[in-house]
Every structure is written in C-alpha cells, then in structure tokens.
C-alpha cells in the first residue's frame, strides 16, 4: 500500500472511478487506478507519492531535466516504483490552499541593472499587461507585450536567481523559473517575489500578468509571514479539507 496526493492545477481526480478531493492524501493498494481529467484552471498538476518515486538521483534530486540529460522522459506503460505507507489520510485546510487567480499581479523587487533602464522603460513594465508566450517552459516564462527599452552595450554574464526578470534586445521580458540557466547576460530589471513565481508558472499561454514594485523589506516581511504560516499549518483528517472536483 502507499499514499498519494494531487495538488496544483484544478483537475478532476478519480480513484477507481470515484471522484476524490485534491490537496488530500489517499490510500492506494495494488491494482487501484488514478485518473486525472483536464484542468479547469492552472497549467500543472502534481502527483506526490509517499517516499517519492524510485528513480536515479542527481545532486540529491530525482527531478528530470531533459535539456541537461538528467533522467529520462516517462514513457507510456512505464512502471515507476514508490515507497510504502500506512499513513492516515490527511487534508490541507481549505483556507490554506493556494488560489489560482486569473491575470495575477506579480510582486517584484527591483535590482540588477535597474539603474540602466530609463524611467519610461520602467513605467512601461509596471504599467502594462503582458501575455504568456507559447514558448514558455520550465526554464523560463516568455512574455509578450509593449516593448521595454533594454539598455544597450556589452556586459559580463552573471548569476541568475529564481524569478529573475531579463529584458533581451527585443524588449519582451523573460522570467526565469526552476530549470533556468545558472548565468545570463541580458539586462535584469529585478526579481519576481519567490512566493509569486508559482502563480506565473500556472498561467496558460495567452493568460495575462502584470507587475507591482515592492521594497526588499516588504519582500522579506512577506516571506517571513508565509514561512510562519507554513510552520504553524495543521493538517486535517481526510475528508475535512481539500477541494472536490467533478
């Protein structure tokens, strides 16, 4: 036996043909089946199993990064091993489940080459809506919208971080995500707050986003508040939380 949970996008979860709640753990035995329907909202759903999947680890992680040749793509019919579990079924409290909202406003701490961008370029960035491009992936989210005047001139490549906002010569910003490259040479306007990056990752192509500037101190306070909320989170018995989908 093992325990599984499905979170993320708003999908319909069925176990052995019965509709079950998201954001809850569910006990499974040999021969049980899981079916995920199309997402009503959001881009990615996550299937978690107790103890993780049995796969070769690279740098302490079993995540697959095909671009770097780390791991392999899952094939139809492939069998994955997972850990056993006899845990009680638990559920995330409904009030603690992240909400998938349309047209999210992403908070940004300005930095990088901020001083090299004109005031007009900053006004365009923070005063406009941008659409998620079809070319987005786990490496980064490309955005389409009003062109932002990018500083000219050569510069040395430097380290990138989760949420870094690069502005290439075409003026269309790129927000770097989990599979980002380690260094980059495009001018950087700032960094999307780490707490907001998942909102961008869950946006489908064509969805719109906008940006709001916050201070480093405000960002630190928001992260501390979120960390405290997670540390004080109390799961509920299965059936007393989660989100039921049809």
Regions found by a protein language model. Give the residues of each.
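Conserved "landmark" site that anchors the functional core of diverse proteins
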Residues: 1-246
């Amino acid at each position: 036996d093992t325990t599984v949970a499905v979170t993320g996008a708003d999908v319909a979860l069925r176990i052995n043909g019965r509709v079950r709640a998201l954001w809850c753990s569910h006990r499974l035995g040999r021969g049980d089946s899981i079916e995920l329907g199309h997402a009503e909202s959001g881009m990615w759903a996550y299937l978690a199993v107790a103890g993780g999947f049995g796969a070769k680890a690279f740098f302490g992680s079993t995540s697959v990064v095909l671009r770097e040749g780390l791991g392999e793509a899952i094939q139809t019919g492939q069998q994955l091993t997972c850990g056993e579990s006899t845990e009680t079924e638990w559920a995330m409290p409904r009030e603690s489940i992240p909400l998938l909202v349309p047209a999210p406003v992403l908070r940004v701490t300005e930095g990088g080459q901020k001083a090299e961008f004109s005031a007009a370029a900053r006004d365009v960035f923070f005063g406009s809506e941008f659409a998620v491009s079809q070319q987005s992936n786990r490496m980064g989210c490309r955005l389409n919208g009003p062109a932002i005047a990018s500083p000219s001139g050569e510069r040395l490549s430097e380290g990138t971080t989760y949420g870094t906002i690069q502005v290439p010569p075409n003026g269309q910003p790129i927000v770097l995500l989990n599979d980002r490259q380690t260094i980059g040479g495009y001018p950087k306007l700032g960094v999307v707050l780490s707490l907001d990056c998942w909102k961008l990752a869950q946006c489908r192509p064509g969805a719109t986003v906008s940006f709001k500037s916050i201070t480093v101190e405000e960002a630190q306070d928001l992260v501390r508040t979120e960390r405290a909320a997670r540390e004080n989170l109390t799961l509920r018995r299965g059936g007393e939380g989660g989100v039921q989908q049809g």
